């Protein structure tokens, strides 16, 4: 829950001086990105901006306190303030912040600005007391906010010091409106107005001006002069003499003498006790001070002018002026030291009664009351964990004695999940083992199940499949249905283990069960995870269309539950990119990979390795080796500076080995082969992938025999486990091995099976990536005219993509090639005496590449009848009658020019 008073603009008090000259300056605030009000305490920053904000509807107000240095809390209040200003216009951002489903503050703000793009009216956000922020992450995020906020938005920041917001750049670009302490200081005229409102006896203008000069226009000092004069029935001049030259750091003695010592004991006690509350209402005051009718007491304090600020229009919430509140808290620690723990306990109980556990924890920590802290955590910690209030949780758990944790295993489980969420896997098992060893009472079966479910998750994260399987099954036996979260975890781990072991059908069923459980209990990140796993399984089985449909369901869940900024969203974008790449939709594949990198932009660069590998893969499919090399340089740097799951390594190695194949870099392949450990098994898609990388490197080096052994074993595994996509890839690599070894019949057999299997997988680019060797074989198959219709169509599509991206054969018949050909001593006399036109050479190249007449017309952007004329002319010049004769003639010319065909 959010405290309403932190989102309420201060109510304009009676007897305040309207700062007309400053309000005139602020009237053009909408022309600036940032309005910055800076001064020491007590210069009237908040009062000025509350006057300016009066009557403005599209304005949100966020009053900070020390607790707002927690990123999650800061984000919650800031988005709530924006929602307040816009009438709940930014629903997606609000949902993301409520569920803590954002990668960073900057990415949350990026989503916010997308939603604000269609907000047309001027919009204002006021952040008061920004000097309380000392978290550099928040400073960075607010710099991002200022750089990217909409043009019609103005941020208003009130601070005692110059905030770390990169304001120099705004100042240079005239996008900053500044008001400092010199401008905030009262003028003679304003001081006269002030005293006329506050003093019972009028004061002469000269005296008022002199008093104003004595305290340099400091509003707090003027207020103290008036307060002291009223309390002591003394002259304002007497008070002013004491305050002359004083500043905030020397106020304590004055406030004791002139304020605290001049109120009755009951009011003094009330002031000191209530100052421990960062904000207060009737119920809090009654519980903390013991006074009946807390609302009346607050209003009386306000009437006396004792620096109390009303924080909302209803008058329910109040807070002390920061300067006075800080002074009172310091005095409370001195004067009520013995009572202090009890006061904090009372505050914690009252906050709990009103449903604010985070504020209650603040007071329980201050009271040093471990029992109270434990009780709050037992009742509310899991809710806070699910809302990602991780910093406060960690601080709270650290404050509890180990003995308290041992007596409450659920708190140990919570601490372990905190470690898990921070990827401190080794510490999780250490903590749980120590707890089990030192507990004086044995845990019940359900708690054992909770522990084992978490251990299973840690084991699978660590790649220990057997231990993960054992622990997940034990956990499912131990856990009652009521422990739904741990059951979801254990079921998910069980499904993932089955996936890793190649038991795809069983894994798919378990992941579907996980999805149903997670959806039923609104555990959205596990719901998303289970759908992604289903898509991966369907992809591995060769059902790419079904995998696509699972991904569509996952994208819908991401949109509905605002999961765009979870790292898992990158996983979804990545597998969509892989699927699009397989189907030769390269632009879309690359766009998804870039989106995935954007999702992870606030994380360690190593997290982007997989998407970066896909960027390389897209460049390789296009034949753009320069771009591929550029991406590879970064990829190899990341590989050398991190530890990765075997799946990540195999995907990175795949594009490296293909690049070496395309560039003929046998040295790099040999070095890699020497250093790369061989996987123990080949029973899932990532182990198959790494073995395939090894075989490809061996083929490049001419080591056909070991490569063939690898591929035959891979195929045996793939067939038995129904890893049909891997079988499709393996057959293509086996085809290349046979082709290079001169075993043309076996090469054709492997290729025919791969083409047939591609009717199921839809693969295009896995053929294209093999380049000219693949193109030659497909041309021959097309010319034989024996392929079934689907395979024939796919072969023609693959050939077209090879020609488009790799510029094989078509490029050989350009002007430079033709000139060299005509000057060759062995060129046929018929070509020398009846030379083809440049267009006819192009048509011959496309005929050789396997293009139909319609495809040639499309490639050259001319009418089909024109192509027929070109073909008739070139047949006549070459002395051939049939298409196959023209292909053979082109092949002879290419061989003569030294091209391997």
Curated annotation (Swiss-Prot):
Superkingdom of the source species: Bacteria
GO molecular function terms attached to this record: ATP binding; DNA binding; DNA-binding transcription factor activity
Protein purpose: Positively regulates the transcription of the maltose regulon whose gene products are responsible for uptake and catabolism of malto-oligosaccharides. Specifically binds to the promoter region of its target genes, recognizing a short DNA motif called the MalT box.
Family annotation (SMART domains): HTH_LUXR
Activity control, per UniProt: Activated by ATP and maltotriose, which are both required for DNA binding.
Protein source organism: Klebsiella pneumoniae (strain 342)
Name recorded for this polypeptide: HTH-type transcriptional regulator MalT
DNA-binding region location: 853-872
């Amino acid at each position: 829950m959010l405290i309403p008073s932190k989102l309420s603009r201060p109510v304009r008090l009676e007897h305040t001086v309207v700062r007309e000259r400053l309000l005139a300056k602020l009237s053009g605030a909408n022309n600036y990105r940032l309005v910055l009000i800076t001064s020491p305490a007590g210069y009237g920053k908040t009062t000025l901006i509350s006057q300016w904000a009066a009557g403005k509807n599209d304005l949100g107000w966020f009053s900070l306190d020390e607790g707002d240095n927690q990123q999650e809390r800061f984000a919650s209040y800031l988005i709530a303030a924006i929602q307040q200003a816009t009438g709940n216009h930014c629903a997606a951002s609000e949902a993301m912040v409520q569920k803590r489903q954002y990668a960073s503050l900057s990415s949350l703000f990026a989503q916010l600005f997308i939603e604000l793009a269609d907000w047309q009216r001027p919009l204002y956000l006021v952040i008061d007391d920004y000097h309380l922020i000392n978290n550099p992450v928040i400073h960075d995020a607010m710099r991002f906010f200022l750089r990217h906020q909409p043009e019609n938005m103005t941020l208003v920041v009130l601070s005692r010091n110059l905030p770390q917001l990169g304001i120099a750049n705004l100042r240079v670009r005239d996008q900053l409106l500044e008001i400092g302490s010199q401008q905030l200081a009262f003028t003679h005229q304003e001081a006269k107005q002030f005293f006329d409102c506050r003093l019972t006896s009028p004061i002469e203008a000269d005296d008022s001006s002199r008093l104003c000069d004595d305290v340099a226009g400091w509003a707090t000092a003027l207020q103290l002069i008036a307060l002291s004069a009223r309390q002591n029935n003394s002259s304002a001049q007497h008070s002013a003499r004491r305050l002359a030259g004083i500043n905030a750091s020397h106020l304590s003695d004055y406030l004791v003498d002139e304020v605290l010592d001049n109120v009755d004991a009951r009011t003094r006690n009330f002031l000191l006790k209530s100052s421990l509350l960062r904000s207060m209402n009737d119920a809090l005051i009654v519980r903390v001070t013991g006074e009946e009718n807390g609302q009346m007491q607050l209003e009386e304090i306000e009437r006396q002018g004792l620096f109390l600020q009303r924080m909302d229009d209803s008058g329910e919430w109040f807070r002390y002026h920061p300067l006075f509140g800080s002074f009172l808290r310091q005095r409370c620690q001195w004067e009520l030291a013995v009572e202090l723990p009890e006061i904090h306990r009372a505050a914690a109980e009252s906050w709990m009664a009103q449903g604010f556990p985070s504020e209650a924890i603040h007071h329980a920590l201050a009271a040093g009351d471990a029992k109270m802290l434990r009780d709050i955590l037992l009742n509310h910690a899991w809710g806070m964990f699910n809302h990602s209030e991780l910093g406060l949780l960690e601080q709270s758990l650290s404050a509890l004695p180990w003995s308290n944790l041992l007596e409450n295993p659920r708190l140990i489980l919570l601490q372990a999940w905190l470690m898990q969420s921070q990827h401190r896997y080794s510490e999780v098992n250490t903590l749980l083992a120590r707890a089990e060893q030192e507990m004086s009472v044995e845990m019940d079966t359900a708690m054992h199940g909770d522990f084992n479910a978490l251990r299973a998750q840690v084991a699978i994260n660590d790649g220990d499949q057997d231990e993960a399987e054992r622990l997940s099954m034990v956990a499912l036996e131990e856990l009652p249905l009521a422990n739904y979260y741990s059951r979801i975890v254990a079921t998910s781990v069980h499904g993932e283990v089955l996936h890793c072991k190649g038991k795809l059908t069983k894994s798919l069923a378990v992941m579907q069960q996980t999805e149903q459980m997670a959806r039923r209990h609104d555990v959205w990140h596990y719901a998303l995870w289970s759908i992604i796993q289903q898509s991966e399984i369907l992809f591995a089985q060769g059902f790419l269309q079904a995998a696509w449909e699972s991904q569509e369901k996952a994208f819908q869940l991401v949109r509905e539950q605002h999961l765009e900024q979870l790292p898992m969203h990158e996983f979804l974008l990545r597998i969509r990119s892989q699927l699009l790449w397989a189907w030769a939709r390269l632009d879309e594949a690359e766009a998804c990979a870039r989106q995935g990198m954007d999702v992870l932009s606030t994380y360690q660069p190593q997290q982007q390795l997989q998407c970066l590998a896909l960027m390389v893969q897209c460049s390789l499919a296009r034949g753009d080796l320069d771009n591929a090399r550029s991406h590879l340089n970064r990829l190899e740097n990341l590989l050398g500076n991190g530890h990765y799951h075997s799946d990540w390594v195999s995907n990175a190695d795949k594009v490296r080995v293909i690049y070496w194949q395309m560039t003929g870099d046998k040295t790099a392949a040999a070095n890699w082969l020497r250093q790369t450990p061989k996987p123990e098994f080949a029973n899932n898609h990532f182990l198959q992938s790494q073995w395939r990388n090894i075989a490809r490197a061996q083929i490049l080096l001419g080591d056909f025999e070991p490569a063939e052994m690898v591929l035959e074993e891979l195929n045996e595994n793939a067939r038995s486990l129904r890893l049909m996509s891997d079988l499709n890839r393996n057959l293509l690599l086996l085809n290349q091995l046979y082709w290079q070894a001169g075993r043309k019949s076996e090469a054709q057999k492997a290729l025919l099976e791969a083409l047939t299997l591609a009717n199921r997988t839809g693969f295009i680019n896995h053929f294209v990536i093999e380049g000219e060797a693949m193109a030659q074989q497909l041309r021959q198959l097309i010319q034989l005219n024996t392929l079934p219709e689907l395979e024939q169509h796919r072969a023609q599509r693959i050939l077209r993509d090879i020609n488009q991206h790799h510029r094989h054969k078509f490029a050989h018949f350009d002007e430079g090639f033709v000139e060299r050909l005509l000057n060759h001593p062995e060129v046929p006399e018929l070509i020398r005496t009846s030379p083809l036109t440049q267009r006819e050479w192009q048509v011959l190249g496309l005929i050789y590449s396997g293009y139909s007449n319609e495809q040639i017309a499309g490639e050259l952007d001319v009418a089909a009848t024109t192509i027929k004329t070109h073909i008739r002319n070139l047949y006549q010049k070459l002395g051939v009658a049939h298409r196959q004769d023209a292909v053979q003639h082109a092949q002879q010319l290419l061989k003569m020019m030294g091209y391997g065909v």
